[in-house]
Amino acid sequence: MTAKIFIDGEHGTTGLQIRSRMADRRDVELLSIPQEQRRNAALREDLLNSADIAILCLPDDASKEAVSMLAGNNNVRIIDTSTAFRVAQDWTYGFAEMDKAQGDKIRSARCVANPGCYPTGAIALIRPLRAAGILPDGYPVSVNAVSGYSGGGKQLIAQMEDESHPEHLTVNNYVYGLNLKHKHVPEMKAHGLLDRAPLFSPSVGRFPQGMIVQVPLFLEDLADGATVESIHAALSAHYAGQDIVKVVALEDSAKLGRVDAEELVGQDTMKLFAFGNPGTGHVNLVAVLDNLGKGASGAAVQNMDLMLSA
């Protein structure tokens, strides 16, 4: 049976990517609202309520409004890509590889909150260490990351690419979120199983897509006996048996001179690396992903496929 899918916000960066990924599929029927009609609330509500799955690619407030339009209609399942519901108790977090049971939870859920791009990498690195008891309570986790500028949506893309834009940017890299109140921190804490908020420092580079997320650690402050080998083993065990999150072998990581933020552009996978210096007791965990792939639209389509397989 063909599933009806409505992408609310299909003309934005994430919406366009999701639509493109489903353009040639015959198992789904894409319901669409013309761009000139996108502010027609009645038409939008009708399409939302006509779908089997509504994928919301909207700002937080608009997503909340869309969900309110579906109140009482349990026939429509929802995937929301905003930050509005990522720590809500009655929503399922849409990171299927987060633990062994998460894929089944997504499969049976009515409401799925698609993860943020930065949290996808951070949680992938942090949660297995918390689950294994390696990362203790109270540890001051810091997360440093750089994203391609497409993560800022159409406005930032225009600022980076259009030289005639009144706010054209010529910088190659900048740090933001300087007030340390980035909207992705709550989901990093909640789904990373942390008991205190991580210190998150995001930045943007002059490349369209791609992402690196880093979590530096001090071995002396981890569980007794922790080594880069035991950390790598915990990551490997956590993601064993699936093919989306790949943990790079320690011997292969040791041969690298650099890690490329753009390595997985156009792919929906993620790579995790563990680097260590036994002499200093320093470890650096690194995640590489496409911010619009596993970090956004790819994850949304993956979640949709899980929900359709129920």
UniProtKB/Swiss-Prot annotation:
A single GO molecular function term of this UniProt record: N-acetyl-gamma-glutamyl-phosphate reductase activity
InterPro entries: AGPR_AS (IPR023013), AGPR_type-2 (IPR010136), NAD(P)-bd_dom_sf (IPR036291), NAGSA_dehydrogenase (IPR050085), Semialdehyde_DH_NAD-bd (IPR000534)
One Gene Ontology CC term in the entry: cytoplasm
CDD domains: AGPR_2_C, AGPR_2_N
Catalytic activities: N-acetyl-L-glutamate 5-semialdehyde + phosphate + NADP(+) = N-acetyl-L-glutamyl 5-phosphate + NADPH + H(+)
The protein's enzyme class: oxidoreductase
Pfam families associated with the record: Semialdhyde_dh, Semialdhyde_dhC_1
Main location: cytoplasm
Keyword NADP appears in the UniProt entry: yes
Pathway per the UniProt entry: Amino-acid biosynthesis; L-arginine biosynthesis; N(2)-acetyl-L-ornithine from L-glutamate: step 3/4
Compartments reported by the entry: Cytoplasm
Entry's EC annotation: 1.2.1.38
Signal peptide coordinates: none
Family: Belongs to the NAGSA dehydrogenase family. Type 2 subfamily.
PANTHER family, sorted: N-ACETYL-GAMMA-GLUTAMYL-PHOSPHATE REDUCTASE, CHLOROPLASTIC-RELATED, N-ACETYL-GAMMA-GLUTAMYL-PHOSPHATE REDUCTASE, CHLOROPLASTIC-RELATED-RELATED
Name this protein carries in UniProt: N-acetyl-gamma-glutamyl-phosphate reductase
Lineage: Bacteria, Pseudomonadati, Pseudomonadota, Alphaproteobacteria, Hyphomicrobiales
